[in-house]
Amino acid sequence: MSTTKIIAIGGEPAVGKTTLIRQFFSNYSPWLRFKYKKLYGHYNKKLHLVILGVYSAKEVFSGTDRLSMSVQPDFEEFIDINKKWEKHNPNYNILFEGDRLFNLKAIKKAETNMNLKVYLLESKYVDSRHKDRNDNQSEKFLKGRQTKINNIKEYLNDRYEILVNDSDADLKRNYNKILSNFI
């Protein structure tokens, strides 16, 4: 089994996944940008960590939401390359969140090649957060995301951890929990 870790963070829209990941950018620097085909991300040498996705200040929809809809094959190739080179180089850990890569296919690929840890964020403030950010995600889309998360939970069969993300204190605790995987 691989010694490098891949941390996947999922949850319904507006639970605070992107806000949680932004804590890494606020607390560590520098971050170098990288690109592998259609897969973009940020690398921090001190944490030995790659965060997948595109994060820009002030964007509501950042992270893997900013990647191409056709990024999945490049993600899978990237995971294979990471596994292949692990024997020769001290490789990096990988962290991602969001709908684009948080799917069964990506999770299955990750768990066959790396030490996978899955966190699911939940919040009782999802409805008010949708209003606060003025998003226009349809009820059909939101129900589809709920179904997707439920299917992933069923597949993982309790091999995930739920993180409540209702307050600033929760955000800090969740950040420290995820950070502890890398330090």
Regions picked out by a protein language model, each given a short descriptive name:
Residues 18-31:
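A conserved segment at the C-terminal end of the G1
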Residues 9:
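Hydrophobic anchor at the beta1->P-loop junction of P-loop NTPases
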Residues 29-45:
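Switch I (effector-binding) loop of TRAFAC-class P-loop GTPase G-domains
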Residues 97-98, 110-131:
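Conserved phosphate-donor/acceptor-positioning beta-strand/loop module used by diverse small-molecule
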Residues 40-100:
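Conserved nucleotide-sensing/catalytic segment adjacent to the nucleotide-binding pocket
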Residues 12:
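P-loop (Walker A) phosphate-binding loop of NTP-binding proteins
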Residues 15:
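ATP-binding Walker
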Residues 153-183:
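NTP-dependent small-molecule kinase module
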